[in-house]
Amino acid sequence: RRKKEEPCTDIPHDRFLMVSVGSLIPRKGFGRLLDCCARLKAEGFAFRLLILGKGELETALHEAIRTNHLEDTVQLLGFRTNPYPYIAAADLYVCPSYVEGFSTVVSEAVVLGVPILTTDSSGMKEILGESEYGLVTENSDEALYTGLHRMLAEPETYQHYQQKVKERASFFSLSR
């Protein structure tokens, strides 16, 4: 729990804040997450997405951010030794992966009490149930978009998951 309390001065929190952490590789789904962000921004939603990680797609993702005019919405922050302050500051943790094992970072978001939206890949339902403790969407681009749209447009849906993730956090412990 101490790691989440370390000071982090580069987290802008002037609007709904989404965070995603992972290697910038194709199976992690960051390209489709940026596509969803472009659609949501075009629809007038105010939010910010911080992506923490490094990898082979870094240049392509920077280009997609420029092409889709997302410079004021999406930031690639690179690798961070301690991602906890970013996750803890988030309004929503997003896991857009095509393929994922048991996700340590999703478990960490649960422990930190951060609502989660994830695509359905291995291990997610073990952590979140059938969308009981976090929104688990079909593993498709459109379902990811729809889930993000719901979290931004439906305060009752967001608040529901805000409460449920706190219930689920009681099953986990950071001290292990």
Which residue stretches match the model-derived regions?
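A conserved mid-protein helix/loop that constitutes part of the nucleotide-sugar donor-binding site
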Residues: 16, 20-39, 45, 49, ...
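Nucleotide-activated donor-binding/catalytic signature segment of Leloir-type glycosyltransferases, i.e.
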Residues: 62-78
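Aromatic "clamp/platform" in nucleotide-sugar-dependent glycosyltransferases that forms part
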Residues: 79, 98
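Short acidic/histidine- and often glycine-rich active-site loop of Leloir-type glycosyltransferases
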Residues: 108, 121-131, 135-136
